[in-house]
């Protein structure tokens, strides 16, 4: 499987006309046991961070070996081994574990400080986390230096910081940098880079990456791959194909499935037709409990309220606004949502007072609206 993934990445990069010089850190460069004397005498970038030096199938053995070494090391040597363990975890996308190790390490030497910075930055970027107020700027990171995967890390930082211009400058060579990463990182990051290429309309790279997805069934069949195919079709103006594929992705449970439901709702609201709105209502209602918490749940409820309102179903719209207030009372949007709900309630009770609802339906609705 490891060779299959690597060959697939290389094939895609050849289609993208990535220079052969960036295809470094092939599996033959990996080492079972880190020889730091050799690394220190070699390329600095590999000394800072090289996730491909770890065997993709050797987590248990590598970890056992590193733990055994820890017992016999002291001082700077122990720090070095702990950073090796953090890098090992990162190579397998165990980012929480890698971050926990790094939090316990206090590097003393310039070389160790540099490596600690590179590892810490890599954990943040692979996790997709934006920098905090105390995070040093990326351009001071070892990952921004003379590395074959510099554009890869720069693109992840641009995505995390919403820097569209820097992302546009780095997205194309970032696919070359992706080839220097282990398969666990490729699986995790390929959808992120593909989405960036879609939004930047880098069609040649999008087409090649979508073909690569076809050779990785675990991604192609996942909601992420399905959603991104739909988004690519939508970006190219093929709304019918996009809607069909979005509906497939919306049947899942992860964040890409939620985003597919939101996309279906947005397309229906833009269309305005009753059939499209009813389809969006069904999609949103069917998945309203599939994702709880955070901005995605809030966005689903907001879209559902808008769809109800567009269909003239103000009672369900106001009840949905009530759900939002119950679920997210501390959000900044709470005050305008409450005002919107009060306005809709006034309209509903005015209509009820004017006899626009059958008496039995009005009584049942009134009971539902009671706090």
Question: Where is each model-derived feature located?
Answer:
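Gram-negative bacterial Sec-dependent N-terminal signal peptides
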Residues: 1-35
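N-terminal leader/linker segments that initiate helical-solenoid repeat arrays
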Residues: 24-80
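Solenoid-like repeat scaffolds
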Residues: 33-40, 67-76, 103-111, 136-148, ...
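Generic helix N-cap/helix-start motif at coil->alpha-helix transitions
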Residues: 42-46, 76-82, 93, 109-117, ...
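Helix-turn-helix repeat elements of alpha-solenoid scaffolds
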Residues: 53-64, 90-101, 122-135, 159-172, ...
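Post-signal peptide N-terminal segment of secreted/secretory-pathway proteins
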Residues: 67-133
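Residue-level recognition of tetratricopeptide repeat
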Residues: 87, 120-122, 156, 195, ...
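Glycine- and small hydrophobic-enriched segments that form the cores of compact globular domains
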Residues: 106-112, 116-162, 166-169, 177
């Amino acid at each position: 499987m490891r060779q299959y993934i690597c060959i697939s990445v290389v094939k895609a990069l050849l289609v993208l006309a990535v220079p052969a010089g960036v295809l470094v850190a092939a599996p033959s460069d990996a080492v079972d046991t880190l020889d730091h004397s050799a690394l220190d005498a070699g390329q600095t970038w590999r000394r800072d961070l090289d996730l491909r030096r770890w065997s993709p199938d050797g987590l248990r053995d590598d970890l056992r070996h590193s733990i055994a070494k820890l017992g016999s090391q002291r001082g700077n040597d122990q720090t070095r081994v702990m950073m090796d363990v953090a890098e090992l975890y990162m190579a397998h996308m165990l980012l929480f574990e890698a971050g926990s190790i790094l939090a316990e390490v206090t590097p003393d030497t310039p070389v160790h400080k540099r490596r600690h910075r590179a590892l810490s930055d890599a954990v943040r970027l692979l996790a997709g986390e934006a920098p905090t107020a105390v995070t040093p700027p990326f351009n001071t990171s070892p990952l921004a230096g003379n590395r074959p995967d510099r554009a890869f890390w720069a693109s992840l930082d641009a995505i995390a910081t919403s820097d569209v211009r820097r992302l546009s400058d780095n997205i194309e060579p970032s696919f070359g940098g992706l080839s220097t990463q282990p398969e666990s990182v490729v699986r995790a990051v390929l959808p992120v880079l593909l989405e960036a290429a879609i939004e930047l309309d880098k069609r040649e790279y999008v087409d090649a990456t979508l073909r690569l997805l076809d050779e990785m069934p675990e991604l192609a069949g996942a909601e992420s791959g399905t959603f991104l195919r739909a988004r690519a079709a939508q970006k190219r103006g093929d709304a019918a194909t996009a809607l069909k594929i979005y509906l497939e992705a919306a049947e899942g449970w992860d964040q890409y499935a939620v985003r597919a439901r939101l996309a279906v709702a947005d397309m229906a609201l833009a269309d305005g037709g009753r059939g499209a709105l009813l389809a969006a209502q069904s999609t949103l209602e069917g998945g309203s409990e599939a994702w709880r918490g955070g901005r995605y749940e809030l966005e689903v409820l907001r879209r559902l309220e808008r769809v109800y309102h567009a269909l003239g179903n103000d009672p369900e719209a106001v009840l949905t606004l009530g759900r939002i207030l119950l679920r997210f009372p501390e959000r900044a949007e709470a005050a305008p949502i409450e005002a919107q709900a009060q306005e809709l309630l006034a309209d509903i009770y005015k209509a009820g007072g004017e006899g626009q609802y059958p008496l039995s339906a009005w009584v049942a609705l009134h009971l539902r609206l009671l706090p």
